[in-house]
Amino acid sequence: MIVLADHHDRQFRYLRLSLTDVCNFRCGYCLPKGQQLDPQRPALLTLPEIRHLIEGFVALGIEKVRLTGGEPTLRSDLVDIVRAVAAVPGIRRVALTSNGWNLRDRLADLQAAGLTQLNLSLDSLDAARFQAITGSSRFEAVMAALEQAIALRLPILKVNAVLLKTLNYPQLSDFVEFVRDRPISIRFIELMQTLDNHDYFQQEFLSGSVLTEQWLAQGWQPIKRDRTAGPAQEYCHPNYQGKLGIIAPYSPNFCQNCNRLRVTSRGALRLCLFGTGEFDLRPWLQHPDQRSQLLEQVQQTLNFKTAGHQLAEANSGDTRNLATYGG
């Protein structure tokens, strides 16, 4: 089997596919200026195009697909997309990242269609603080989706919280206590600077090392990562059912274990979340007979993947916000 690899000896088995660039939340760290979309932008990838895309990437060794947004539940055909992706031979895991606003009543259908992992964005366990961060009053709906996911016993259930120095770090102990009796993983993501959130970043950035130092002192132990795992380092504790984790893009050598590629909701391959430029794959997603051309295009494009991002130098590439690419 072909395994995608770049010039930096990194293998890629994980694809993040954005299903839409539209989001119905207005998180300060992501869309501080609101969402400004080009009305003339191309249409979203269709279900047949998505199927051709996944089949092509599986032929290149991809084993895990994460469906992101924007907010992917805004797609009315989401269940059909999950079913199509899960049906491709070679796919070991189908994951979904969602803000959970309209997820609870769709979870059973998504699980039946083949969803094996859910990552729910939840930046606070307090309704008022949640609204202050996200601009949404749907806290109860998100919590209901989380409890439903626990009840359905999804194989992998994770909560993502962007680490914010003044807005949720003071409630860190609440998150830790939340996993004591719940079989979920809560991962804190270091706030990343984009072209739109400079002031917010300056106010709210906090290094993830602050958390890991506390956890290690409290007896939490690091867990070995799977080869298709995302960038999080997770920790377990004998007194807790759940896990804690940190995604620290500002840490040294963060990019040396990169194992994922991104495709936008319009069919463009993006080599790095904080890179520049995209490579349009859509012309090779129209018919199965184009498979060899698609594979060749992906392999050639991978030659342009750099060794790492330049976030530490305050260089966000051309990324205005994270909603466009799904983070």
UniProtKB/Swiss-Prot annotation:
SUPFAM superfamilies: Radical SAM enzymes. Its EC number is 4.1.99.22. Pathway: Cofactor biosynthesis; molybdopterin biosynthesis. Residues 7-232 form the Radical SAM core domain. [4Fe-4S] cluster 1 binds at residues 23, 27, 30. SMART domains: Elp3. Keywords: 4Fe-4S, GTP-binding, Iron, Iron-sulfur, Lyase, Metal-binding, Molybdenum cofactor biosynthesis, Nucleotide-binding, S-adenosyl-L-methionine. The keyword Iron applies. The keyword 4Fe-4S applies. It catalyses: GTP + AH2 + S-adenosyl-L-methionine = (8S)-3',8-cyclo-7,8-dihydroguanosine 5'-triphosphate + 5'-deoxyadenosine + L-methionine + A + H(+). Its cofactor is [4Fe-4S] cluster. Binds 2 [4Fe-4S] clusters. Binds 1 [4Fe-4S] cluster coordinated with 3 cysteines and an exchangeable S-adenosyl-L-methionine and 1 [4Fe-4S] cluster coordinated with 3 cysteines and the GTP-derived substrate. S-adenosyl-L-methionine binds at residues 29, 70, 121, 192. GO terms for biological process: Mo-molybdopterin cofactor biosynthetic process. GO terms for molecular function: 4 iron, 4 sulfur cluster binding; cyclic pyranopterin monophosphate synthase activity; GTP 3',8'-cyclase activity; GTP binding; metal ion binding; S-adenosyl-L-methionine binding. Catalyzes the cyclization of GTP to (8S)-3',8-cyclo-7,8-dihydroguanosine 5'-triphosphate. Belongs to the radical SAM superfamily. MoaA family. HAMAP family: MoaA_B. Monomer and homodimer. This is GTP 3',8-cyclase. It comes from Synechococcus sp. (strain ATCC 27144 / PCC 6301 / SAUG 1402/1) (Anacystis nidulans). The lineage of its organism: Bacteria, Bacillati, Cyanobacteriota, Cyanophyceae, Synechococcales.
